[in-house]
Amino acid sequence: MDFLEIVGQVPLKGGVEISGAKNSALPILAATLLSQQEVKIKSLPQVVDIKAMALLLQNLGASLEWLDPNTLQICAKSLHHTEATYDLVRKMRASILVLGPLLARFKECLVSLPGGCAIGARPVDLHLKAMQQLGAEIKIEQGYIHAKAPKGLKGNDILFDKISVTGTENALMAASLAKGITRIINAAKEPEIAQLCAFLQSGGVEIEGVGSSELKIRGVESDALNLKDIQIIPDRIEAGTYLCVGAITNSQLKINRIIPNHLQAITDKLIEIGFSLDIQENSIEIYPAKQRQAFEITTKEYPGFPTDMQAQFMALATQCLGTSVIEETLFENRFMHASELQRLGASISLKTNVATISGSTELTGSDVMATDLRASSALILAALVAKGVSRVHRIYHLDRGYERLENKINALGAKVVRLKEK
């Protein structure tokens, strides 16, 4: 098992290029199961979750060829079975995304209940109800979802009681091959969903309301779905994380290959804290702040402040003047990084879903343990400003979602080394 050793308080400067968005790539990879045509997906990040999804597609019988480290050619014409086994699915929760495509195309599938980060319950009920609304029969037996629709899926209204990103994506993909018209009400509005819509539209699926909370989909036949090659959008959470690298170290950094509109909740908050930003068409440069002010954050669905950035901003809060407050409204049990930040010297108090962080704190290097993907990046941020050497353990969480993070940070001047546990 690997860990990162980080020397703190090293000056940083330069630029970093953002990788493709893991959270856009995963549903698009799953969507290739809908079609019998060959398609190329470009700008795939080389992270564990993408490799796991590619392996799952291959296990189902899809033909895969890596044309370069970030471009995958896929043809799902000759799938030989429709069972997503526990061994493959347990590694990440996003594997539930194969449920909609397999059910829609083959009228029956068996998908293991998924794994991934241990953040709250994250129930799959919303996915299952969506499939049932389209006419599927669902049973859960021995840890597997058995879904079938002998006469095929039929368009219908799907109302989500709670906004769900992956639930919306699964419903979108299933509706793409359903007969008639489907309306998804209270749909998630993330940019990653908009790109999935664009991918499905490229194959002939008619979708209205892209970017809104109500989507209207007119399905097509599988053999008529001709998906076009696509380039994955930049990862807004990775971009936000590197903006926080600049913010916590109070450095001048340029974040390249981004879509600034996707980052507005993050950049608005950084400006409120006291940073100057030069926002261009596909880059943002952050400049050192004369004084960093404490802040308040409440996580919300897009376009609100992303839950995937609250851990990084908690680390940043330790260096701001005054007391900051972060309220997590989307997931339970998502403050596990707080106790590890405390090991570095952070002053944080927790009350249910609210964290209060005292600022202007001198952090000291220590051994800390990553508990999930975004927590791992928060610990690295804190280690960059801590006095002395820190070691971040269990970075397999980090490798699920960040491409070559230590290489990118080291290119800015940091001293980060990946080592093996003894």
Swiss-Prot record:
What are its GO biological-process terms? cell division; cell wall organization; peptidoglycan biosynthetic process; regulation of cell shape; UDP-N-acetylgalactosamine biosynthetic process
**Can you say where in the cell this protein is located?**
Cytoplasm
Top-level EC class, please? transferase
Q: Which GO terms describe its cellular component?
A: cytoplasm
Residue sites binding UDP-N-acetyl-alpha-D-glucosamine per the record: 93, 122-126, 308, 330
Task: Fetch the InterPro entries from UniProt.
Answer: Enolpyruvate_Tfrase_dom, Enolpyruvate_Tfrase_sf, MurA_subfamily, RNA3'P_cycl/enolpyr_Trfase_a/b, UDP_GlcNAc_COvinyl_MurA
Please give the pathway this protein is involved in. Answer: Cell wall biogenesis; peptidoglycan biosynthesis
Q: Mind listing the UniProt keywords for this protein, alphabetically?
A: Cell cycle, Cell division, Cell shape, Cell wall biogenesis/degradation, Cytoplasm, Peptidoglycan synthesis, Pyruvate, Transferase
Which residue windows are coiled coil? none
Q: Which residues bind phosphoenolpyruvate?
A: 22-23
For molecular function, the Gene Ontology terms on record are: UDP-N-acetylglucosamine 1-carboxyvinyltransferase activity
Q: Which reaction equation describes what this protein catalyses?
A: phosphoenolpyruvate + UDP-N-acetyl-alpha-D-glucosamine = UDP-N-acetyl-3-O-(1-carboxyvinyl)-alpha-D-glucosamine + phosphate
> Which Pfam families does the UniProt record give?
EPSP_synthase
Q: Which CDD domains match?
A: UdpNAET (cd01555)
Cite the active-site annotation.
117 (proton donor)
Q: Which Enzyme Commission number(s) are listed?
A: 2.5.1.7
Q: Which domain of life is it from?
A: Bacteria
Question: Which positions carry the signal peptide feature in this UniProt record?
Answer: none
Q: Does the keyword Transferase apply?
A: yes
Mark the residues carrying the PTM 2-(S-cysteinyl)pyruvic acid O-phosphothioketal.
Answer: 117
* Biological role stated in the UniProt entry: Cell wall formation. Adds enolpyruvyl to UDP-N-acetylglucosamine.
What family is reported?
A: Belongs to the EPSP synthase family. MurA subfamily.
By what name is this protein known? UDP-N-acetylglucosamine 1-carboxyvinyltransferase
- Which organism encodes this protein? Helicobacter pylori (strain G27)
The UniProt gene name for this protein comes to murA
